[in-house]
């Protein structure tokens, strides 16, 4: 079964581009305003926070994800000068071409390996 990934962002073009880049997985895209509801509706294997989500909103969404799942897998896309969102998130730099796809594969593969132990 394909992993379920929620991509949260406030730029529709970036959301479509990222969904296409990650088409090997089952993707849902949503803006940050509607992300809380999307998180409540179903569990996701990975939540991706775009750099278009303001840091305060990203922190709120991370807190909400923690309420719903004690071990959420969250990937934050950040430009090199952004502050970290905390140790609960994986981070990928926009300056690395193909970095998003490889980071997602690495995170999801790690979870499969960990659950098989």
Language-model features: locations:
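Conserved hydrophobic helix-helix packing surfaces used for dimerization/oligomerization
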Residues: 3-5
């Amino acid at each position: 079964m394909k992993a379920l990934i929620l991509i949260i962002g406030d730029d529709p073009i970036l959301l479509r581009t990222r969904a296409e880049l990650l088409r090997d997985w089952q993707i849902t895209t949503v803006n940050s305003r509607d992300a809380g509801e999307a998180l409540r509706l179903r569990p996701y294997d990975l939540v991706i926070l775009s750099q278009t989500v303001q840091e305060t909103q990203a922190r709120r969404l991370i807190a909400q994800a923690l309420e719903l799942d004690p071990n959420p897998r969250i990937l934050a896309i950040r430009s090199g000068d952004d502050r970290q969102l905390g140790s609960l998130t994986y981070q990928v730099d926009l300056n690395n071409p193909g970095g998003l796809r490889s980071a997602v594969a690495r995170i999801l593969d790690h979870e499969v390996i960990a659950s098989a132990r």
